[in-house]
C-alpha cells in the first residue's frame, strides 16, 4: 500500500473498514455514500495517513459491502485494517448533487454571514448525532458553536462564492434583541 499525503487534501470519507469476513482477507465495509456500487469506480482509496487501498472485489450484503483489497490475503491482515476510514479526493466525485445537497468538504471553511452581510464566523465542521445535521461554526470571537443545518437556520448556501447566510435567531445565535 503506497503512501500519498497529497491525496488527503480536500478528501471525502466514503467508507469505514469493519470486521473481517471469512479467512481470505475480505472485510465488511460500511459505505457512507448513497450509491455504494460507485465506490469501485473511484479507483484507489486512501486512509488518514495517505496509505492507498485498491478494491479488487466488491459485493453488497444488506447495508454493508464485502470488499477484498489488493495485498490483503488473510484474516489477520484484514483485522489490522478494522476501523480505518477510507477517503477519495474531492475532485474525483461526480457533481450530480441536487440544489439542497452538498459534500461536507465543500461546506467547511465557508464564511457565515447574516442577512445583512455581516460576517459572523466560518464553518469548521459538520456533525449528525441522530437528530439532524449540525454545522460547527467558529465565531469571530473565537468561540465555537453548533447551529442546525436546516432551511430555517441556513437561508442560503453559495459554495462558488464561499459563504452561507444564516438567520441568527433560528440558528440560536441571537435572541432577537437589538444588541446581537
From Swiss-Prot:
Gene Ontology terms, cellular component aspect?
Answer: cytoplasm; ribosome
Domain named PRC barrel is located at 99-172
Main localization (coarse) = cytoplasm
Location in or out of the cell: Cytoplasm
What are its GO biological-process terms? Answer: ribosomal small subunit biogenesis; rRNA processing
Q: Which domain of life is it from?
A: Bacteria
Q: Which UniProt keywords apply?
A: Chaperone, Cytoplasm, Ribosome biogenesis, rRNA processing
Q: Copy the domain comment.
A: The PRC barrel domain binds ribosomal protein uS19.
Function according to Swiss-Prot or TrEMBL:
An accessory protein needed during the final step in the assembly of 30S ribosomal subunit, possibly for assembly of the head region. Essential for efficient processing of 16S rRNA. May be needed both before and after RbfA during the maturation of 16S rRNA. It has affinity for free ribosomal 30S subunits but not for 70S ribosomes.
Assembly information from the UniProt record: Binds ribosomal protein uS19.
State the name under which the record lists this protein: Ribosome maturation factor RimM
From which organism does this entry originate?
A: Bartonella henselae (strain ATCC 49882 / DSM 28221 / CCUG 30454 / Houston 1)
Amino acid at each position: 500500500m503506497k503512501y500519498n499525503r497529497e491525496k488527503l487534501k480536500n478528501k471525502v470519507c466514503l467508507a469505514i473498514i469493519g470486521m473481517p469476513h471469512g479467512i481470505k482477507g475480505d472485510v465488511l465495509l460500511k459505505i457512507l455514500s448513497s450509491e455504494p456500487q460507485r465506490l469501485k469506480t473511484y479507483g484507489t482509496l486512501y486512509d488518514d495517513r495517505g496509505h492507498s487501498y485498491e478494491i479488487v472485489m466488491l459485493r453488497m450484503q444488506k447495508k454493508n459491502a464485502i470488499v477484498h483489497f489488493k495485498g490483503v490475503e488473510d484474516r489477520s491482515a484484514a483485522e489490522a485494517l478494522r476501523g480505518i476510514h477510507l477517503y477519495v479526493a474531492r475532485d474525483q466525485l461526480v457533481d450530480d448533487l441536487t440544489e439542497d445537497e452538498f459534500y461536507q468538504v465543500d461546506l467547511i471553511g465557508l464564511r457565515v454571514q447574516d442577512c445583512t452581510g455581516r460576517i459572523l464566523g466560518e464553518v469548521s465542521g459538520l456533525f449528525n448525532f441522530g437528530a439532524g445535521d449540525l454545522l460547527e461554526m467558529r465565531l469571530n470571537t473565537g468561540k465555537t458553536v453548533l447551529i442546525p443545518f436546516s432551511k430555517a437556520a441556513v437561508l442560503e448556501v453559495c459554495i462558488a462564492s464561499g459563504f452561507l447566510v444564516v438567520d441568527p435567531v433560528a440558528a440560536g445565535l441571537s435572541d432577537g434583541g437589538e444588541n446581537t
